[in-house]
Amino acid sequence: MVAGSGRTYRTVYRHLLTRVDPEVAHRWAFAGMRAASRVPVAPHVLRRAFVEPDPRLRTRVLGIDFPTPLGLAAGFDKNATGISALGNFGFSCVEIGTVTARPQPGNPKPRLHRLVADRAVVNRMGFNNAGAEVVARRLRQLRAVPPVHPVVIGVNIGKSKVVAEADAAQDYATSARLLAPYADYLVVNVSSPNTPGLRDLQAVEKLRPVLRAVREAADGAAHRHVPLLVKIAPDLSDEDVDAVADLAVEEELDGIVATNTTISREGLRSPAALVAAAGGGGLSGAPLKERSLEVLHRLAARTRGSLVLVSVGGIETAQDIAERLDAGASLVQAYTAFIYEGPGWARRVLGELAASRSRRETDRPS
């Protein structure tokens, strides 16, 4: 059934969705997933079709039990409107957002472009979201009626565009205060290329007060320790990656999410005219694989197991997942592969990962 659904999706994607504006196509597809999950028996049917995680894939990270190490990266569900639905399609964790303290429309459209030859997406969405207060209300309602199949909920927070850099720490803290009570973990996003000046906050002297303000606000509002991670860009120099890693250890963060999208366009297969037409913004997907893995290796060597590392960027196959886990990641996330491969993708790669682990255990000398 999963293989069939994958073929059907790719046919629909090729003949219909690629003819539609990518943002509209995303809205249609996401609405369809939510609608399917609202049918009374659908969650059970979908879970049987798309999930059934192998017990060998279970992992405990951040004090949380994850049925598998694969989560959906931030950006797909910006406003917490489809967490349970997405869990039905095989993700053990859904990271919502990016959410800002103030609601904002994001950047002008069109702001999402496909580079199909590269299996990549270019976005300059600009943190379009309903704002922390609205998203917190949705999360509170979700927590009040637990789903049949619980999903780990990560919340990714960013700076409101209208807020000056000098006030960034308090802006992040406002989001943390509202959202932390309903989050399994929080991610401070200082690495999107689509909010002017945001990446400047990755500098240690600017990042430190943001992290401290978020931690104090989150733990105070939730009356518990809320695991806190920071998400970094792949475009940081190796020295800057080291500096952020050192800061994360020094400030006793729980982990690092690496990496966000890239502003680089090197090595793309798509025609130059198509790349130029896509314009600026962050590129995700297969071209990010090499740099994302490089950053992971560097972080693992620098932090020596003292932080949880969540690897994101260019993950498409079970082999990619295994490679990231072997390189030091505790969890992995994906987004672009889900867009290109469709609803059966997560279960397929997780099944292949479980089979690979089984073979490794069988081949291990006794």
From Swiss-Prot:
Membrane topology of this protein: Peripheral membrane protein
Molecular function in Gene Ontology: dihydroorotate dehydrogenase (quinone) activity
Chain sites annotated for binding FMN: 74-78, 98, 156, 189, 231, 259, 285, 314, 335-336
Co-factor requirement: FMN
Subcellular location: Cell membrane
Keywords: Cell membrane, Flavoprotein, FMN, Membrane, Oxidoreductase, Pyrimidine biosynthesis
UniProt record, GO biological process: 'de novo' pyrimidine nucleobase biosynthetic process; 'de novo' UMP biosynthetic process
Cofactor binding summary note: Binds 1 FMN per subunit.
Enzyme Commission code: 1.3.5.2
Reaction catalysed by this enzyme: (S)-dihydroorotate + a quinone = orotate + a quinol
Protein residues bound to substrate: 78, 123-127, 189, 194, 260-261
Gene3D superfamilies per the UniProt record, alphabetical: Aldolase class I
A Pfam family reported for this protein in Swiss-Prot or TrEMBL: DHO_dh
Cellular compartments per GO CC: cytoplasm; plasma membrane
Pathway(s) this gene product operates in, as recorded in its UniProt entry: Pyrimidine metabolism; UMP biosynthesis via de novo pathway; orotate from (S)-dihydroorotate (quinone route): step 1/1
Active site: residue positions: 192
Family classification: Belongs to the dihydroorotate dehydrogenase family. Type 2 subfamily.
Oligomer and partners: Monomer.
Job description of the protein: Catalyzes the conversion of dihydroorotate to orotate with quinone as electron acceptor.
NCBIfam families xrefs: PRK05286.1-2, PRK05286.2-1, PRK05286.2-5, pyrD_sub2
Protein name in UniProt: Dihydroorotate dehydrogenase (quinone)
Native species: Kineococcus radiotolerans (strain ATCC BAA-149 / DSM 14245 / SRS30216)
